[in-house]
Curated annotation (Swiss-Prot):
Residue(s) carrying Phenylalanine amide: F9
Organism: Penaeus monodon (Giant tiger prawn)
Tissue expression pattern: Limited to neuronal cell bodies, neuronal processes and sinus gland.
Main function: May act as a neurotransmitter, neuromodulator or neurohormone.
Homology family: Belongs to the NPY family.
Protein name: Peptide tyrosine phenylalanine 2
Length: 9
């Protein structure tokens, strides 16, 4: 992941 602001679960 590059530049992840909000991880999607």
């Amino acid at each position: 992941y590059s530049q992840v602001s909000r991880p999607r679960f």
